[in-house]
Amino acid sequence: MAEVGLSQNSYASANHDKKSEQQIRRRVAEFHPNVWEYEFLQSLSSPYGAPSYCERINILIEEIKMDIFDGLVGDGEKNMNPSAYDLLERFFVVDILQSLGIERHFKKEIKAVLDYTYKYWNDEKGISLASGNLIVDLNTNALGFKVLRLNEYYVSPDVFQNFQDEMGQFIDLENFKEDESKLRSLLSLYRASEICFPEENILKQAKMFASTCLRQAIEENRELVNKSQLIIEVEYIMKYPWTCRVPRWEVWNYIKIFRGDTDASMCMKGVYEMPSDKRTKILELAILDFNILQDQHHNELKILSKWWNETKVKELNFFRQRHVEFYFLYACGLYEKELSATRLCFAKVGALITLLDDIFDTYGTIDELVPFATALIKWDMSIMNHLPEYMKTCFQFAYKTYMEIATEAEKIHGPCVQKWMHDTWKTIILAQLQDAEWIANNYLPSLTEYLESSVPSTTVPVLSLFSMLLIDTIFPDDIIEKITKFQSCVAWGCRLVDDSKDFQDEKEHGESASWIECYMKENPGTTRKQALDHANMLIESNFEELIKHRIFYEYCIPSTCKRLYFDMYRSVAFIFKDIDGFSKSSKAIRDDIKKILVEPIYF
């Protein structure tokens, strides 16, 4: 890497003055412009900010506590006549509330319910349908495993060995496509298998078995006009793996499924059926909660678009202007009203880092980039004197954005944030400069070289740390050391997801270094398909590590920080699911953004 010295004025001047701006041949990736017009975002309006809707939510919360939880919270001493499925009922209620995104209103009640059910969980025998009988079925155990594990209770997947026969099947498959109870059990098994830690082979076997059966059921019902809600739910779960089922997207889809569930398939027809009046209250709360949060997002999008409209960099046409897409990525995971500052921070830093990424990867020349990197690291405006105007504009934008965030972060967490931010900032600038030098020299690095530079250049460390510092919660003094392992796992996963989707586009833009290309270089004779298959295997194993970090991380860090990292990865997996939906904001991605951020759900 070219040395980033104390001063690059003469270096920049000597090289840049040799050619006028018109003579410099710049690479341009021809990204499409920002698709979210200022006027459109400023026009967003919603009635759900009115106090009456918040009052209605509070009423519904109290009614649900009385109507549903009063019968579920407590043990046998308070409930002398438990139903024939009281444990399954508890798991079902918690699962529905979490799928609909309203569980935060019932934290105390949910903990009491799960503490009760956990007393009956046995890692060898599993759990029965009810506290008063010994009937053990696959659906209850699969749903219970998923709910308990996601809520940080230790449960072993060994219970599923009780349901696996010598042929590897977990259920009698006779007429399973027409038998809703069997199909529901298969769906619960699949959803449980998605919450897999490394080396849990029984869950991998369960996933393979359940996914094969569920895909057969989908194919069998493909031509039906009036599909059951259970089949619609199966189609959704199989189309969007848990890897990319970000919370707000999950909520939107489950509201649709729950609302259309007139045949009570979600309520496990024939086993447990929730009374319609209780279902109606839960659905009303979920829709109101979604719309009220969306009203908050409308207000934030107005702030964000106003901020962007007042910048000078918006006039530059060589980079991806994706501030709304960044906001969407973050809001899908951390959506609560009190996290407004961190959402806006993520979108602003994302817009800044994308600008710098496109300068270093595509638009800038190496003669410009070396002094530019020094200026960014040292915040030295004097270095910019002999650099082109577009870089001066970008430097001023970077400096202002960085300092605004640093000022706000210091108010919350003290002066220690200055070093944290600068160390992370320096790392990404140097990593991007390294990438630029490889491009300039047409150099394809070794896999080791690539990983040392490309993981920091994913932008994960900067985006996550800067946003985290605007979360108003108490951090341990050694928070940076504690998040390192989690952060590295997310960065590595995002790098693989990114490279596996857009390596061909980047190669056409002159960016030959991607994990795919480096792996093929290091393994002569490997085809691109083989390299992609290997990348997908690494993505899957890395996600298993992420799941374990999310649920049982070895260090004590605030739960909001764990959510930030975990859902940041899932948001990237979501937007890169089929294509690089970030660089190419397709109609499908725009429609998804509208569903979550723009269009209310009507009753």
UniProtKB/Swiss-Prot annotation:
Amino acid composition bias (Polar residues), ranges on this chain: 1-13
Tissue: Mostly expressed in leaves and, to a lower extent, in stems and xylem.
Protein's GO biological process: cadinene biosynthetic process; diterpenoid biosynthetic process; green leaf volatile biosynthetic process; sesquiterpene biosynthetic process
Binding residues for Mg(2+) 1: D357, D361
Domain of life according to the entry: Eukaryota
UniProt cross-references to Pfam families, sorted A to Z: Terpene_synth, Terpene_synth_C
Its biological purpose: Sesquiterpene synthase involved in the biosynthesis of volatile compounds. Mediates the conversion of (2E,6E)-farnesyl diphosphate (FPP) into beta-cadinene. Not active with geranyl diphosphate (GPP) and geranylgeranyl diphosphate (GGPP) as substrates.
Protein name, entry field: Sesquiterpene synthase Cad
